[in-house]
Amino acid sequence: MIQKYTYGTPFETDAIVTSIPTSEGTPAYGTISTENGFSFAYDMDDNDVVYGLGESNRGINKRGYVYESNCSDQPNHTEDKISLYGAHNFIVISGKQTFGLFVDYPGKLKFDIGYTLSSQLKITCEDADLYLYVIEGETPYDIVKQFRKIIGRSYIPPKFAFGFGQSRWGYTTADDFRKAADGYRENNIPIDMVYMDIDYMEDYKDFTVNQENFPDFEAYVNEMKEKGIHLVPIIDAGVKVEAGYDVYEEGVEKNYFCKREDGSDFVSAVWPGWTHFPDVLNADARAWFGQKYERLISKGIDGFWNDMNEPAMFCTPEGVAELKEYIKDNFMDKEEAPGFTLGDKVNALANNPEDYKRFYHNVNGQKIRHDKVHNLFGYNMTRAAGEAFEKIAPGKRFLMFSRSSYVGMHRYGGIWMGDNKSWWSHILLNLKMLPSLNMCGFLYTGADLGGFGADTTRDLVLRWLALGVFTPLMRNHSALGTREQEAYQFENIEDFRHVIGVRYRLVPYLYSEYMKAALNDDMMFRPLAFDYTDDAFATQVEDQLLLGNEIMIAPVYTQNAKGRYVYLPEEMMFVKFLPDGTISQEILEKGHHYVEVALNEVPLFIRKGKAIPVADVAQTVKDINPATIRMIGYEGAEYDRYDDDGVSTL
C-alpha cells in the first residue's frame, strides 16, 4: 500500500508517473514537523536495517552515518563524503516495522541515519514543500517493487551496450581512438564501444567535432562501425560563451539559458571557459537542447554520455571578484605571508554553494532559484536527450547515461558511478551501490573499471573486470595523466582476453535478466536479505549480491588474495570460468566457505535448482552465435530466456 502526503507547495519533479491521491492526516510511522522546514523522525530498534539512497557512500545498510541528497561534483569517494553525484531519496526500513519512504523534494535533503543519535532516523530539509510517499509491504523487496511501479519503467539500452567499452580522458585525435580500438581487435579482446571524452570537440563546445582531428567525422564513425565499434561521445552541461557559436547565439536569442536575478544570462567557468547553462527545467529550452544531439546522430552516432551536469562549476565572475577583494583586503601591501586560508578561498571557487543561489530557472513562467531544485538539473539534461531521441529516430534505442541524476531520470538513461579512484576499496563500493541504485530504478549502471583517478595495477584491473563482467555498463575508463590501463597494455594479455570474453559468454543471460527487470519493474541486483528473509546472517552480508533469480556474485576485492570467504544461504553450485575456456562446477553446502579464485578466473554461484545460458566467446555482441548457447547449472533446470532485436524500442 502506498500513501501520499503533501506538505506546502511542492515542486513537480515528475519523478512519480502514477496518480496517487493525497492522504489526510499524518503517516503511521515517525513524527513530522513543518516548523522551520521539514523534519521526519523515527526511533529505530537495534536490529533495524535501512536500505536505499541509490548512489551513496558506505554500506548497503545505511545505518550509522549521515547522507545528503545534493548532486555534487565529488571525485573523491572517501568514506567522509556525504554527497555524490545523484539524489535518490528512497529508503526502506526493515525490522520492528517494515516500510519505505520516498521524499520527493528537489533541493538539499539530509538523512541522519543513526549518526547524531544511534537509535534515530531523521530526515530534514529547509523548506516544508514536498511530497512524502509511505509504502507498506511484507518485505523490503515487496516495498521496492511497489515503488518501482509508480516511478515508471527503467531505461532500455540497445543490446550492443551490454558489450565491453574502452574510454580514457586524453584520447584526442582520430588516431588515438583508432589505436584504442585496434589494440583490442589485434589482440582478439572483445569490445563494442570506444568512448570519446571532451577532447574530440572543438574548444570543448557541445555538439561540435574538431575538424582538424576529424576532417570527415561521418566517414570516421562508419570506419569504426565496420570494425564493430560504436563511438560514444560525451556532452557537457555548459555551453561556451563565444560569438559565432550557433548553439550559444540561439540560446541567448531565445532566452533558453539560466538567468541571474537581474535577468541577464548566468555565467560560470567549466571546460570551455565561460559558459551558460541551458535551462533544462524549462520545457521549450529542454526540447531545444535535446534536438542538438541530432547533429551527431546524423553522423552515425548512436550513444552518448552526459557529464558535468550537477551542474559542476569551476568558478563564477562573482566568486572571482569576491576572491580578488579578499586578497586586496587581507594580503596586498602587507608584509605577512598569506596563510592557509588563502588556499581555502581559492579552492572554494569551485562548486561554491553560494553560486548555486545566483541563478534561476523559468518554469511555466515562474522564476525558481536553482538551489531549490538543484537535484533536477542532470535528470532534465538527460531527459532532454531521451525525449529528443524519440523524435529524431522514432523506434530506435540509443545508449545514454549520465553522471548526475534524480529519481525519474532512470526512465531516460543510466548512470555511471562517477570519478572513482584506482583503489581496491572502490571495487567494494561499486558492488554495494548496485542494489541501492536498482531500488531507485537505475538498472543500467557500472563503475569506471580499473579506477578513473590514480595509477592502477594489473591485478586491480583484472579483479575489477571480474565484477564488471556482471554490471550492465562495463567500461574501462581512466584520467589524463594516469597510467594507461587498456587491457592490451599489461603483460599476459591472454588473462584480459579471457576475463572480458566471459562477459560475452554471459550476455544471453545478463541481457535477459536486465530486460526482465526493466519490463517487470524489478531489481537486477539484490542484497541476500531481500530473498533470504528468515536468514539472520544474510542480513549481515554486504560483499555478495544476488543477480536475477539464478546466481549470486561474490568478487575478490583484496590485493594479493588467492580467493575469499563466502556465505551460502542455501546449497549452491560454485562455478568458475577458467582461462583455458572450460567451466568448473562444484556443489557447496549451505554455510561458510573459503573458495579459491585465481587472478584470471571469474567466479559465480548458481542457486539450487537453477541453470543459466552461456554462449561461446564473440568479438562483439552482435556476433554472439545463438547456436552455441548451452545451459550450465543444476541438471534438468530450465531457464526462460528473453531476447529481442536489441535495437527497437519497446
Question: Model regions: which residues?
Answer:
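Aromatic- and carboxylate-enriched substrate-binding clefts and catalytic-loop regions
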Residues: 190-496, 531-532
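Glycine-rich, histidine-containing beta strand-loop boundary motifs that form or position
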Residues: 42-44, 55, 94, 102-105, ...
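Extracellular structured ligand-interaction cores
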Residues: 37, 85-89, 96-98, 106, ...
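Short acidic-glycine loop/turn motifs at beta-strand connectors
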Residues: 92-97, 260-262, 569-570, 579
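A residue-level signal for conserved active-site and pocket-lining positions in enzyme catalytic cores
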Residues: 90, 147, 184, 224, ...
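Short, hydrophobic/amphipathic alpha-helical packing segments
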Residues: 66-71, 84-87, 178, 286, ...
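Catalytic core of carbohydrate-active enzymes
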Residues: 28, 38, 63, 78, ...
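Catalytic and substrate-binding clefts that recognize carbohydrates or anionic sugar/phosphate headgroups
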Residues: 1-158, 168-170, 174, 181-186, ...
